[in-house]
């Protein structure tokens, strides 16, 4: 009898055990390639400015993924694609105390419709103004991350539209993703230095010469520092300043064209943080030294900001220039050059008083205006509130050869043809001022920068491509940064007395505080929900229980099987 029992058991195991094993492996062992995915994530801004806190105050993430379609988001990592992102969905995640928010960006922003780009640019300041302890990250889309998002979205959507039994079954059998960051909690960066660069071209004809100051801030800004490339704001201004340094260094190298003006060039750091570099530079030159070009005879200060696009040009002033002043001369020469050489360009002066009650200044020239130095900002933007000045969407450089081909350009970008035109307008205007050409009877259609002295569009293109090849957020550029070193080298090629100016926040009452952990590695692990372990344990226990009862009552089972399988005797 036991030999027959052994034979029956052996036949049962041959059939059932391999099938059970395969079923078990299918349920708990997904493909190895999909078990985990590692990708880079970029954290939202976190900084303090003049006592106000901005951005996300947390960096640690270890929680399960959901999409915003899920009804319950508490302690979950909420994933959203940029195309589906809205401020209402973001607020929903914060209200439900989400564990984190991950916003997935496309690799090619030009694939996004213009309305989505514009909407997100307008939302970036609101995201930063809403201080939160929820970690907020941005990730660039790839095939694996998109697959994770799609699976998570299907799982999240099914929970809200199914019955309770279906939700329970789906919860027990579905795969989830545990999102984990590898970095530590963010902390304040101590003794961070913001670097600014200064260089000059000394005029000819005496010691007490008037000085023209040309200024551009080189840092970029956006909702995530590691995604802030600042092509137009303010890579365009930096490129123009460097090209002006090259052009006027050539003019100042010949005795006949060596003008009676000092030209002072200043690349300021911390421009996106209320112009901290400019503020300290003015303090050092006006309060702490007697030998400064800023103390004697400043004709005017011209700040260059966001000049890489558009057929509009605006001269922003805090106080309209008086007739007969150098500032008025600059205004009139600008109008002359635009009218005679570039009639397609629309030029206008924009007057806005300095509002000291605001948390931040509107334009860089206001820093000089506070110290009673005559200053302007030249920009193609009509308002300082334009979202294009502070957006991660400002990352594209477009050459004229690509215009009109393929998809239309979306978002802020640099049009090299218009950047070159604006550079020439500024150069021609400055030349007419320092050589006093209008009073000498020179007509406005005379072009000075032609042939060997013309603006080099190829050099402008190289500068913009280099500036936009890496993020230039102030938190990422220490005093030994390759960007700072290269800018210093470029200035040294054309200017004299190139020097650095460092700004460090006061330790007792800092005006600005930066934080670390702005870029991390995130891992998405494929996991089963906790209830799956309970369900699996119940199934295994039931299987073993049935097997135990079958062995204990094998005599009854054997007799039953004999009766079922015994051949029937035919009755005649």
Curated annotation (Swiss-Prot):
GO terms for molecular function: ribosome binding. InterPro entries: Nicalin (IPR016574), Peptidase_M28 (IPR007484). It comes from the Eukaryota. Residues 1-35 form the signal peptide. GO terms for cellular component: endoplasmic reticulum membrane; multi-pass translocon complex. Residues 36-530 are extracellular. The chain crosses the membrane at residues 531-551. It is a single-pass type I membrane protein. Component of the multi-pass translocon (MPT) complex that mediates insertion of multi-pass membrane proteins into the lipid bilayer of membranes. The MPT complex takes over after the SEC61 complex: following membrane insertion of the first few transmembrane segments of proteins by the SEC61 complex, the MPT complex occludes the lateral gate of the SEC61 complex to promote insertion of subsequent transmembrane regions. Antagonizes Nodal signaling and subsequent organization of axial structures during mesodermal patterning. It comes from Danio rerio (Zebrafish). Residues 552-572 are cytoplasmic. Component of the multi-pass translocon (MPT) complex. GO terms for biological process: determination of left/right asymmetry in lateral mesoderm; enteric nervous system development; multi-pass transmembrane protein insertion into ER membrane; negative regulation of nodal signaling pathway; regulation of signal transduction. Glycans are attached at residues 108, 234, 436. Pfam families: Peptidase_M28. This is BOS complex subunit ncln. Keywords: Developmental protein, Endoplasmic reticulum, Glycoprotein, Membrane, Signal, Transmembrane, Transmembrane helix. Belongs to the nicastrin family. It is found in: Endoplasmic reticulum membrane.
């Amino acid at each position: 009898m036991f030999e027959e029992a052994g034979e029956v058991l052996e036949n049962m195991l041959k059939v059932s055990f391999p099938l059970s094993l395969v079923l078990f492996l299918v349920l708990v062992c997904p493909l190895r390639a999909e078990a985990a995915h590692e990708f880079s994530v970029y954290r939202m801004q976190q900084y303090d400015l003049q006592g106000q806190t901005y951005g996300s105050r947390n960096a640690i993430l270890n929680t399960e993924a959901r999409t915003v379609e899920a009804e319950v988001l508490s302690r979950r990592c909420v994933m959203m694609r940029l195309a589906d992102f809205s401020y209402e969905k973001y607020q929903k995640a914060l209200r439900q105390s989400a564990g984190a928010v991950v916003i997935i960006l496309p690799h090619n922003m030009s694939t996004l419709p213009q309305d989505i780009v514009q909407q997100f640019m307008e939302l970036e300041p609101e995201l930063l103004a809403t201080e939160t302890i929820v970690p907020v990250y941005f990730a660039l889309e790839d095939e694996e991350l998109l697959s994770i998002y799609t699976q998570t979205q299907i799982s999240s959507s099914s929970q809200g539209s199914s019955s309770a039994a279906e939700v329970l079954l789906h919860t027990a059998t579905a795969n989830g993703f545990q999102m984990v960051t590898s970095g530590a909690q963010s902390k304040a960066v101590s003794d961070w230095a913001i670097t600014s660069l200064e260089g000059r071209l000394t005029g000819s004809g005496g010691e007490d010469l008037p000085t023209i100051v040309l200024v551009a801030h080189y840092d970029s800004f956006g909702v995530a520092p590691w995604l802030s490339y600042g092509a137009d704001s303010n890579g365009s201004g930096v490129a123009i300043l460097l090209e002006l340094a090259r052009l006027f260094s050539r003019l100042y190298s010949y005795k006949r064209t060596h003008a009676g003006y000092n030209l002072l060039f200043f690349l300021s750091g911390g421009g996106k943080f209320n112009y901290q570099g400019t503020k300290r530079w003015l303090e050092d030159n006006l309060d702490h030294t007697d030998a400064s070009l800023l103390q004697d005879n400043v004709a005017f200060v011209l700040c260059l900001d966001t000049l890489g696009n558009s057929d509009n040009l605006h001269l922003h002033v805090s106080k309209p220039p008086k007739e007969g002043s150098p500032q008025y001369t600059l205004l009139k020469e600008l109008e002359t050059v635009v009218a005679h050489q570039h009639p397609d360009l629309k030029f206008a002066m924009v007057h806005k008083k300095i509002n000291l009650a605001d948390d931040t200044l509107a334009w860089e020239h206001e820093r000089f205006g506070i110290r009673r130095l005559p200053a302007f900002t030249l920009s193609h933007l009509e308002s300082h509130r334009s979202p294009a000045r502070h957006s991660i969407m400002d990352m594209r450089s477009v050459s004229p050869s690509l215009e009109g081909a393929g998809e239309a350009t979306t978002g802020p970008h640099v049009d090299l043809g218009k950047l070159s035109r604006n550079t020439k307008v500024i150069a021609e205007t400055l030349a007419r001022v320092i050589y006093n050409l209008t009073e000498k009877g020179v007509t406005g259609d005379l072009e000075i920068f032609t042939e060997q002295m013309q603006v080099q569009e190829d050099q402008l293109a190289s500068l913009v491509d280099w500036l936009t090849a890496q993020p230039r957020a102030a938190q990422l550029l220490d005093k030994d940064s390759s960007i700072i070193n290269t800018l210093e080298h470029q200035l040294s090629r054309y200017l004299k007395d190139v020097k650095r100016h460092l700004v460090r926040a006061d330790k007792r009452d800092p005006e600005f505080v930066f934080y670390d952990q702005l870029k991390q590695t995130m891992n998405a692990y494929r996991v089963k929900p906790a209830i799956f372990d309970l369900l699996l344990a119940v199934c295994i226990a039931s299987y073993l229980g049935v097997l135990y009862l079958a062995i204990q009552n094998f005599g009854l089972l054997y007799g039953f099987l004999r009766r079922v399988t015994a051949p029937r005797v035919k009755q005649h």
